[in-house]
Swiss-Prot record:
Keywords: Cytoplasm, Glycosyltransferase, Purine salvage, Transferase. It catalyses: AMP + diphosphate = 5-phospho-alpha-D-ribose 1-diphosphate + adenine. Homodimer. It comes from Prochlorococcus marinus (strain MIT 9211). This is Adenine phosphoribosyltransferase. GO terms for molecular function: adenine binding; adenine phosphoribosyltransferase activity; AMP binding. GO terms for biological process: adenine salvage; AMP salvage; purine ribonucleoside salvage. Disulfide bonds: none annotated. Its EC number is 2.4.2.7. CDD domains: PRTases_typeI. Belongs to the purine/pyrimidine phosphoribosyltransferase family.
Amino acid sequence: MMSNYLSQLISQHKDFPKKGIVFKDVLPLLQHPNELEGLIQGMSTGQIFESSDAIVSIDARGFIFGTAISMKLSKPMIVARKPGKLPGELITHSYELEYGQNSLSIQKKAIENYQSFVIVDDLLATGGTAMCVSEMLKEAGKDITGLSVVVELGQLNARAYLPFPVESQIIF
């Protein structure tokens, strides 16, 4: 887990995207390159990456961190995108958000040469998004070695319901 200083760089927006939600925004971290580099270093050294063949990053903020980790570890990155964003044959699943419902898709061809994956996202809240990606990978006969996130909302206890290890850098 990272320092308290990093958690201070996460901005919080009350009642966004709907009333009752306090949105944790990781984007201000990008304005601090030294801290971002340390964050990526911390995320990249997680044990879950050692036995993975590739990374699946979740639309859209997960792409930022997944790309950096992919480059640092020289591991391929696959994207899980929201509806209507990917061409070709897809695996698609729906999921529940802390504040609604959505779906994600992965290109079948993108994962065919890899067996084990780490899922990367910016934030773990209810775990619905991570489980959605996990279900798509399982449907394709793939393994999940873990989930790596910048922020975890600890009070929601999503990690207790996920069937794979979770590595988070900041817990609120």
